[in-house]
Amino acid sequence: MVFVLLLMMVMVCGWVSVTELVEGDSSRKIVEIICRTSLLKSESSCVRIERVFKVHNTQRTLARFEEYREAVKLKASKLAKKHPRCLADGNELLRFHGATLACALGSAGASSLCASDKCAVCRIIRHGFSSSSSSNSSSKKDGKAGVGVFTTSTSGRAFESADEAADQQDDPAARRALLVCRVIAGRVHKPLENVREFVGQAGFDSLAGKVGPYANIEELYLLNPRALLPCFVVICKP
């Protein structure tokens, strides 16, 4: 139900922009619920929300996202083993991506996106994701750097990845943010100890990095950046 409400809240306009959702706003409450209900018990106190912004994606961005969905569905229809979710909607999921914020967005009422390449949040919203979006220390440690865009099922893990990215940048002023995204997961490959085994395997659209105790995919690498559509920016308190 929460996911359906999120889809209804995503607006499309002629240029990319963001609008702050103030405290008490019904849309903000839904985003807060999404962040809170996704937390694991061990993460219960690590994410404190300071600001929430709604992303207004361009028609072109949304069209690219839908075109990718159709490509995934078409590819799935040609497989001998059918995957119902892939055939239905491309296996769409709601995921979090942690990123650093190097500009004044959210400070003193600022709501404009910056043009700096050093600001991961604004760069992603303006230009979309890239495979380098997965290059945090976690993906490097497990050998998956450069495999795809790193996403998580919990806001707490995404916040940790934003922390890792900030440590890499060595910028004490960088703030942490979460991007709440719709993603087309498509056909998901099970986790691999050696990611080199994955190279050259056709027919998969994403790679599971970590699977939880109930077979839920806690960490997921999207192989194609077009598979992600950022919907909300959640700026976290330090």
Feature locations, PLM:
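Core residues of folded domains in eukaryotic genome-function proteins
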Residues: 90-94, 120, 145-149, 175-179, ...
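Eukaryotic beta-rich interaction modules
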Residues: 72-78, 115-130, 156
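Short coil/turn segments at secondary-structure boundaries
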Residues: 107-111, 162-165, 192-196
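Intrinsically disordered, low-complexity terminal and linker regions
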Residues: 1-114, 233-238
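Short proline/glycine-enriched turn/loop segments at secondary-structure junctions
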Residues: 165-171
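A conserved ligand/cofactor-binding region detector
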Residues: 90-93, 97-99, 104, 127-138, ...
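Active-site and NAD+-binding cores of ADP-ribose-processing enzymes
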Residues: 1-2, 12-16, 20, 171-238
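Extended catalytic/binding region for NAD+/ADP-ribose chemistry, centered on the ART fold
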Residues: 96-97, 124-126, 130-165, 181
